Amino acid sequence: MTVTGRFAPSPTGAMHLGNARTALLAWLHSRALGGRHLLRFEDLDTGRVRGWAYDLTRRDLEWLGLDWDEEFRQSERLDLYAAALAGLDTYPCTCTRKEVLAAIADSAGAPHGEEAVYPGTCRPGSVHPERPAARRWRVPEAESCVTDALSGDTLCQWLPRDVGDFVLQRNDGVYAYHLAVVVDDALMGVTDVLRGADLWTASPRQAALHRALGFTPPRFLHVPLLSNYRGERLAKRGGAPPLSEWREHGEAPGRVLADLAHTLPWPGFQAVPEEVTAPELLPLWGDVLAERPGT
């Protein structure tokens, strides 16, 4: 089987060092296994997209020595998401977030996990006729389990209790992240999804959506997020310095790659020299994979 991986940034601003580290690891994974590597711009939320961010992202990746075999934009694939949505058991929902949280607070149970679980208010068809409607997936009465191929951890979620009916199309017509990423990974032939650990808890619902659409879920590998000196994850919204600052100030890309490698938790990366190329890191990632039978 040919491995296909991907890096899927949102062009809502400039890449920061945390994005660069995830991009590096995704590239190392694809190339260490002799596979294809895709660049996919997740640009469905057009209100937040910045037109200049596409080219800036490409320049930053090329500066680091990271290449890709094919490029995609989600904004050019809307018909595929519409077709997938039509094949799923969904229903209209006119609940606001405030109403959802109020319904949960009034119920006997508390929210499960890190986010509020939709209580099913609109499931019987009781929608507000004067509001635009989102589309929610009526999740099956089933458990969805995912084993992380990197850590070996397994996460199981009972979909109705732990996830709830979740939005696949917003009330403004924008297709939701979970639908688009599942359709894209399946139709692009992505076999291995390496991404940040913040998306670990989303993996069971995405695996369930893969199966509901007749696809085989990919292997998931979740890597630690890069934090600042306060222990907070780097984020565009949090004002993390853009990677382009290092490039524009004449910093050598090899030094940036070495600095990123030194932050990784696996043996060997902390010992790389002060300057290194991306291909020179491939054997180290190969060593990481060799210790994990799931990869």
UniProtKB/Swiss-Prot annotation:
Keyword Iron-sulfur belongs to the record: no
SUPFAM superfamilies: Nucleotidylyl transferase (SSF52374)
EC number: 6.1.1.-
A Pfam family per the record: tRNA-synt_1c
Binding site for ATP: K236
PROSITE patterns attached to this UniProt entry: AA_TRNA_LIGASE_I (PS00178)
Keywords: Aminoacyl-tRNA synthetase, ATP-binding, Ligase, Metal-binding, Nucleotide-binding, Zinc
Cofactors: Zn(2+)
Residue numbers covered by motif 'KMSKS' region: 233-237
Keyword Metal-binding assigned: yes
Classification via InterPro entries: aa-tRNA-synth_I_CS, Glu-Q_tRNA(Asp)_Synthase, Glu/Gln-tRNA-synth, Glu/Gln-tRNA-synth_Ib_cat-dom, GluQ/Sye, Rossmann-like_a/b/a_fold
Family in the record: Belongs to the class-I aminoacyl-tRNA synthetase family. GluQ subfamily.
Annotated function: Catalyzes the tRNA-independent activation of glutamate in presence of ATP and the subsequent transfer of glutamate onto a tRNA(Asp). Glutamate is transferred on the 2-amino-5-(4,5-dihydroxy-2-cyclopenten-1-yl) moiety of the queuosine in the wobble position of the QUC anticodon.
NCBIfam families for this protein: PRK05710.1-3, PRK05710.1-4, queuosine_YadB
Name of the featured protein: Glutamyl-Q tRNA(Asp) synthetase
Organism, as annotated: Deinococcus radiodurans (strain ATCC 13939 / DSM 20539 / JCM 16871 / CCUG 27074 / LMG 4051 / NBRC 15346 / NCIMB 9279 / VKM B-1422 / R1)
Gene field: gluQ
